[in-house]
Amino acid sequence: GAGKSTLLKILGNIIPIEAGTRELGLNVSVGYFSQQRVDVLDMERSVLDEATDGIESSITEQKARGILGAFLFRGDDVFKKVRVLSGGEKSRLALVKLLLDPPNLLLLDEPTTHLDMPSIDAFIEALKNYTGTILFVSHDVHFIRAIAKTTIQIEAGKVTPYAGDYD
């Protein structure tokens, strides 16, 4: 379509820019999520090990398990291998990884696509506590209404900002 996902990928440095420049503010750390990015998960690790891998800040297992629990990974589920997870579970795990070591700019491309309603609601609650900037592309009206403070319509090469959510 209109280039919404491409814009997020450029901002997240996932794809190169063909012309122009990409400039972010000083000390901006970017986290990017799309349902296609679950391929970055290590399939041989446990859910808990994968969730906490590469986190620079020290995080306790209890805190990690708390966030995993909010995303419906409870009890022994945290010891499952990533390879046995469903597509939706892998998406939830990728989101957990972002939220355990949050960047200050979160780019989300259709983040609710493979999630069921309890997972979407858990994700919304986690994002409500997020203190950075969120830029997302979504067709999920429930998600948009819960998260958006400003809406931008991209259509026919034109960008139109609106104050408020979907309504």
Predicted regions and their residues:
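ABC ATP-binding cassette signature C-motif
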Residues: 1-167
